[in-house]
Amino acid sequence: MSKKVQAKQGTDDLVMLPKVSEDEICENLKKRYMNDFIYTNIGPVLISVNPFRNLNNSGPDFIEAYRGKHAQEVPPHVYQLAESAYRAMKNDQENQCVIISGESGAGKTEAAKLIMGYVSAISGSTEKVEYVKHVILESNPLLEAFGNAKTLRNNNSSRFGKYFEIQFDKAGDPVGGKIYNYLLEKSRVVYQNPGERNFHIFYQLLAGASAQEKRDYVLSSPESYYYLNQSQCYTVDGINDVSDYAEVRQAMDTIGLTAQEQSDIIRIVACVLHIGNIYFIEDDKGNAAIYDPNALELAASMLCIDSATLQNAILFRVINTGGAGGAGNRRSTYNVPQNVEQANGTRDALARTIYDRMFSWLVERVNQSLSYYKSPYQNVIGILDIFGFEIFEKNGFEQFCINFVNEKLQQFFIELTLKAEQEEYVREGIKWEPIKYFNNQIVCDLIEGKSPPGIFSLLDDICSTLHAQSTGTDQKFLEKMAGIYDGHLHWRGMTGAFAIKHYAGEVTYEAEGFSDKNKDTLFFDLIEAIQCSKMPFLASLFNEDTGSLQKKRPTTAGFKIKTSAGELMKALSQCTPHYIRCIKPNETKKAKDWENSRVKHQVQYLGLLENVRVRRAGFAYRNTFDKVLKRYKKLSSKTWGIWGEWKGDAIEGCKTIFQDMNLEAGQWQLGKTKVFIRHPETVFLLEEALDKKDFDCTAKIQKAFRNWKAKKHSLEQRAQIAHMFKDKKERQRNSIDRKFTSDYIDFENQFGLQEAMQNAHKKERVVFADTVIKIDRRAKQKNYEMVLTDQALYFVEKSIKKKVLVHTLIRRVGLREIKGVSISTLSDNVIVFHLPEHDQVIENDKKTEIIIVLVEYFKAIGGGSLNVQFSDRINYTLKKGEQKEISFQKSEQCPTLVVKKGGKGLIGTIASGLPSSTDSTPKNYNPNSMSQASSRPAPQQSAGRGRGMPQGAGQPQPQQPQQQQRPMPQPQQGGGARPMPQPQQGGGARPMGAPQQGGAPQQGAGRQLPQPTQQGGAPGGRGAPMGRGAPGGGPAGAGGRPLPTVAKPAPQPSRPTAKALYDYDASSTDELSFKEGDIIFIVQKDNGGWTQGELKSGQKGWAPTNYLQYN
């Protein structure tokens, strides 16, 4: 980025700021925010500023732009961090987690959804994987509907904490997951501050329910329900409750909820609303009474319980006194009436608990769907989306718990990014300048400590000792805190409240309600009333044994949140963390509105300045010696030998790699147990080199496979045309063993030809190209370029015009328009194409290849079987429909075709060829085998690890001790492969096995001897055996060895033997396949590096000598 652009848009990594201060950080974030660059890095930490509008900077196109890219290659983005986490999980095979922090409304939930979307998009697509992806993505709208709400600071505020673990298999595909939910804000069910809403699902149901649902659940407008009308806020800008309800129902289907389960959930949501409409008045005794019996009846009917049972559970509290029924003890039960305030509290407790338990069931149901296939998993990526730090005008127990969890997360961040990093430098002996920072451990101890007791412990003690009291407990709690914490730097007492100086600022908490909310108990008579419900789903949510519960000390809300926070920290500590620090730029929730004081406050309490200083002074990457060696050992030939192992010390291995990569000494340091790399660009360099290494190796393997596949296909084509021509056409000797090459005119570089064809090759695949001889009606001949693609047949004329070579397209015929082809039964090379309008007569010595390729692609395009006629009198059509005939005759005086006018058109004369009964099927063609290898030239070996393998030699080999290196035959002076002995004078080489019947033996193809790589070792990269004549072949050329004249007799037990040092898979029918350790009887040896041997099974063949150890 240029200085001019940076001055306008800001730098995308705060580590690169020229000056480092909180003001400079804020100014840089503002520049980027105003230019719609909402993401900024601090090294690996991502800062995200909520734009409060859609910037269209996510989705499939952006995902593709970040897929597989290193962080230094692409601009900051949530996708960048997600790619880093996913890559680290796959490469290091270690659990990862993404911790998203920031205050309410800063954009944490959206960041979490982007991560889940990215991981789903870049992973595999099997049926099971796609199912898990859908559940992961559809769980978001479902849980948001039941767990999110509009608050004063955020229109879609998460009112619960969620830690989502996505489980991956070894291939990096999601195969399952698990959601952990924390601290649902139950109090919102029954009360909301002015300008806020209850959970989204209530408004979605009332707006989007069908007419039938509204009748079944007796639904009306939000204004009709006490639990919704207290805040006078029913709609939200940018939220469509009708469409959101449809999305929720779709998500329920995707998750796999049955129709009955969906109906039960919607019924419970309606139940909560109807419970809230039960109002109370005071009777003449001062006790609570039902104001409207119809409201009670409606709520009871929705709960599927008797109205009298519900009424008694709300208006009376059952109190048991006395012993447990033993001798001398009497147990008494009393129904104590409640006043209006107590009845309201009981009603609200019932509604809160029903909704809370239904939400917990929903989370567990999503987990069941995620583990539907019960697939084993290798690693996880955890995504933490939890409520942000909250400071309101009036803060209570809920804010205290929320802020405690955020305090723990801040401590976790400090421990891993500031404190632990600096301590590690000292521990490893790395030169380092300490950076000062605020450690909030003191605040965490204040809240959860044991000695001295923390605030949660004091609150639990108050609730335990004063459990029977309902008044005065909050004041006792304040007094007890004052006695212990008076003078504490981060606690301050005041009338009816106390203040804590958190990392994000001082928050004042109203003590009223702390004790009751911490008890978090539901009266047992209420539980027993719900257990009477005739709705099985509702009753299952309250399946506890109330009798045994009464004997236990109840668990407090404070204890639960402390335990949950501890478990969360433990889960996070088992992962490699990645951080997203979300910033809310304003309170108006408007785009382009920047409140500098608010942003600066967040920059301060998030510790961004200290984070920048640590990153500038520290090292971008560190890892243990063995992991660095394992990751980068391919980058040095010394650490990446033929077996891929390094026998030396891990420290020396790391040094070797860095030195061979020419890394400057100042870019890296070696600690006591780890390697430290200073700049991310250096890591990027290593990763890029690693990718290139892998790409090069992959490309070689792919090329070898493509070559093998092409040659196999060529063999199949030759076998097919041999079958087609057998007993129908005489053959020319030089065409019997001719290999198919497809392109004989270097089409890729014939730009004039391509242009004449209107660049058809960009849309069509060229499958044959050559120069042909066009024969016209007067027997005149002219050269054309003929190109056959998978779609059409092209004829192009070349001519010189004004000293310039010009290509002119004569005609293009679609393959499906071809009516057929005709050829004679003699040995000529004439082909007559029967085409629309007029036919085309050509001569070309690759006629067999042309016809078989045309037959193949004619069928592939849907034309069926091409009509191929054999006749010595062929009728063909000229322009304007004139009919002509070309006839063929033999004359031994015409070794090449002679065409003259005569008869009804043209007469072609040619000498006799090989008999039509000649079988031209390739000798090494086996229709039942994939190994058609002996006709293939052996691939060349590459430097480094061996490539270029014969058929069957490419499988991974077991590791061998270095002392068992395979001996490599030494080349003779003069370089190159060692030449084989020349054939004996006076005739061809001896045939393999029994003498071949008939005439002179045919020329054989040489084969290259398997060679170990220069490092020695495994045959994993061996080539094919060198320079030996093919089976049944004639004289070997230069480098060939003399073949035996007759087959040798069966081996006798007294003959010498050899032991196989390595596995070998034969690449032709005359070679011998064997396994390491096999005993081979020696038949004969030659000087060309081959030994003829026989296994105990009687199988005989040739084996490379350097694979054997003679006994």
Swiss-Prot record:
Top-level taxon of the source organism: Eukaryota
Name the Pfam families for this protein. Answer: Myosin_head, Myosin_TH1, SH3_1
User: Which keywords does this Swiss-Prot/TrEMBL entry list?
Assistant: Actin-binding, ATP-binding, Cell projection, Chemotaxis, Cytoplasm, Motor protein, Myosin, Nucleotide-binding, Phosphoprotein, SH3 domain
Q: What happens when the gene is disrupted?
A: Shows defects in pseudopod formation and translocation. Also shows slower speed of locomoting, aggregation-stage cells and significant reduction in initial rate of phagocytosis. MyoB and myoC double mutant exhibits profound defects in growth, endocytosis and rearrangement of F-actin. Expression of the full-length myoB heavy chain in these cells fully rescues the double mutant defects. myoB and myoD double mutant exhibits reduction in the speed of whole cell translocation. myoB, myoC and myoD triple mutant exhibits reduction in the speed of whole cell translocation.
Compositional bias of type Low complexity: which residue ranges?
929-944, 952-967, 991-1012
| Record's keyword annotation contains Flavoprotein | no
Please give the chief subcellular localization of this protein: other
**BP term (GO), one:** phagosome reneutralization
Q: What is the effect of changing S332E?
A: Forms a complex in the presence and absence of Ca(2+)
GO CC terms of this entry: actin cytoskeleton; actin wave; actin-based cell projection; actomyosin; cell leading edge; cell-cell junction; cytoplasm; cytosol
Q: Which family does it belong to?
A: Belongs to the TRAFAC class myosin-kinesin ATPase superfamily. Myosin family.
UniProt name for this protein: Myosin IB heavy chain
Organism whose genome encodes this protein: Dictyostelium discoideum
